[in-house]
A protein has these predicted regions:
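Conserved GNAT acetyl-CoA-binding A-motif
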Residues: 130-131, 159-172
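Conserved beta-hairpin
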Residues: 58-74
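Conserved N-terminal entry element of GNAT/NAT acetyltransferase domains
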Residues: 1-14, 22
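Conserved beta-strand-loop-alpha-helix junction that forms the acyl-donor binding cleft
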Residues: 134-143, 168-178, 196-197, 207
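Conserved catalytic-core motifs of GNAT/GCN5-like acyltransferases
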Residues: 168, 186-204
């Protein structure tokens, strides 16, 4: 199986959104906040599309393809990346994310994402030449076939070529954590995230020196 790695084209944005939505539909990061599958699907499609539009050209979107089909996608932010302003998100249609879904569910998820990503952002800003992977997905039917590990190796080369010395990311899945550790990332922070129903979700932040 030949894998082609590259940079996402603007005309491929919707394809990346659809891929990520399929992969994220069973991820604790979303299922805990959007228990209804129909609402979860709607939010995932809308949220990722609007975020992609807002961030396009401001960060690094990487892909892996097999026979021309996109099978993996990642957003990797360099140390100079600045999150777009609220106005920029609004101008790219962010308010449409709330259309037809429970506003509280979206706001609870956004609050969780800020808290869960904080250790990585703090670590990135405290050091130098550290890149942050804010999103990574592999097409479900292509998981456990070695594509994810090869995709990470591609990021590492991509980051090194641009002067990066470390990468960091977080996950809320034990399965994903085991995968990242197998690929050389080490835990530097772990904490519980309080869920709206009073339960807790574990969050692990990991890093790797390149």
């Amino acid at each position: 199986m030949e894998i082609e790695f590259g940079i996402l084209g603007r005309d491929e944005l919707m394809e990346s959104v659809e891929l990520a939505t399929r992969a994220y539909m069973t991820y604790e990061y979303f299922t805990n906040f959007f228990p209804d599958p129909k609402e979860r699907y709607k939010v995932l499609m809308s949220m990722q599309y609007r975020a992609g539009l807002t961030n396009f050209g401001k960060t690094h979107f990487l892909t892996a393809k097999v026979d021309g089909k996109m099978v993996a996608f990642a957003q990797i932010d360099n140390p100079q990346y600045k999150r777009p302003s609220v106005l920029q998100f609004v101008l790219h249609g962010w308010l449409l994310v709330y259309l037809g879904v429970k506003i509280k569910h979206v706001n609870d998820w956004l609050a969780m994402d800020t808290l869960a990503s904080k250790p990585c952002h703090d670590y990135q800003h405290a050091g130098s030449d550290i890149w942050y992977t804010s999103s990574v997905t592999v097409e479900p039917e292509y998981q456990r076939k070695g594509i994810g590990s090869k995709f990470i190796a591609f990021w590492e080369d991509y980051i090194r070529e641009r002067g990066g010395k470390e990468l960091t990311l977080f996950t809320n899945s034990e399965k994903n954590l085991a995968f990242y550790r197998k690929n050389g990332l080490e835990i530097f922070d772990e904490r519980d995230i309080l869920l709206p129903d009073g339960n807790k979700m574990r969050s692990w932040s990991v890093k790797k020196t390149l």
